[in-house]
Amino acid sequence: MNGTWLIDNLWSHPLRLRALAPWLDDDGIAALTRPKGAPMTQSDVPLLDEAMELLGPDPKIAAQIAAKNAKRAQEEQFAQDTLNSVGLGSGIVSSQMLVDQMNGEGGEFIAQRAAADREWTYGHVVVDEAQELTAMDWRMLIRRCPSRSFTIVGDVAQTSALGGTRRWDRTMNRLFGERRWDLNELTINYRNPQEVSDLASDFAQKAGLYISTVNAVRTIPDAVRRIIVDGESDTIATAASHVAQLAKQFVDADGTGRVAVIAPSHMLDPLRSTIFSTLPGTLGQQETNRLSEQHEWDAQISVGSTESVKGLEFDAVVVVQPGRIEQDAPSRLVAASDLYVAMTRPTQRLVIVRTGEDETALQL
C-alpha cells in the first residue's frame, strides 16, 4: 500500500467516499469520483503527501535511503579524519564540502536531492500567489519548514481557488498563531495607470473583495476604452481589430511588448483564429508569422482565460464579454476575483469589448 494507491482507491469507489464523507451530497460524490487508474491532478498533490505521511515510508525505499545515508556518513567521517590529519580540521573546508567535491556534487545536485526527497526540509520558504493555497496545501508546506519561517506573497482580491484565502488573518492565525506573523500591505501601484487602477479598485470594493488602499503613480489619458457591439460574433471581430492596432503600437520585432486577450473559455479558439487572420492586414504576413510561431510562455500576443494570465503583466489587455466571464465562474466571489485579475494586468491600456446585453448584466 502506498499513497498513490490509497488516493486512487478512494476516488474510484463512490460508496467508500460516501461512507467516509457522509456530508457530501450526490453531486459532490459525482464530482470527486473518477475511473480507477485515472491520472493524478494538481489538487491531488497535497492529498498524496498527507497519505504518504499517514502511511509512513515504504520499507524498501526506507532501507535504500538508510543505506545511502550510512554510506554518506562513512564518507564524511573519512573526509573529516583526512582534514584532521593535515591540520585542516577546523578550516573553511568542511567534511561535507569535501565529500560533495569528491563526488562531483554541487549546489545543483543538492537541489536535485531536495526535489527527489519528499521529507526534505528548508530553513525558510517563500510562497508566491499564496492566496490560492488550500488548507491541505498549507499542511504540505508547513511539513517542509518546521521552523515556520515563511515569506508569503499574495493578493486576497485575486483568489480564484474555492478553498483559498479571502482574509489573511483567518489563514495565518491558524498556521502561525495570533501576533506571531506580520502583515505588510502594498499601497503604491506601479503597474497600472490611475484610470485602470481606479476602475479595478471600485469594482473590487463593490463586489466585496478586500483590497488595500492603492495609489497609482502614473496617469495615461484614454487608458480605459469601452466598446459596445451588437452580438457575440461582433465582439470577436472587434476584439481582433483592436488587438491588431494595439500590437502595432506596443509590440516590437525585438521581442518586447505584450498584448493579451482575456475572454470566456468558449471564445478562446475563435478569437485566436480571428486575431491571427486579421494581423497581416496591419502588421504584414512576415511579422504575423513570427508572432504566431512564438512559444505560449513567451508569446507577445496571448489569448487566454483569467487563470492563464494571473501574475503576469502586459502593455495592453483586451477583456471580452466580462459579464460572461462572471457567469461562468464557480462562485460570485471567484467571478469578482477573476475580473479583478483581468482588469489589473495592463501597464498602458485596457480595452473592454462586450455586447449591450453583457453590459446590462455587469456594470463596469
Locate the predicted segments by residue:
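Conserved helicase NTPase catalytic core signature
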Residues: 1-124, 134-138
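Conserved helicase motor core of SF1/SF2 NTP-dependent helicases
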Residues: 55, 80-124, 129-364
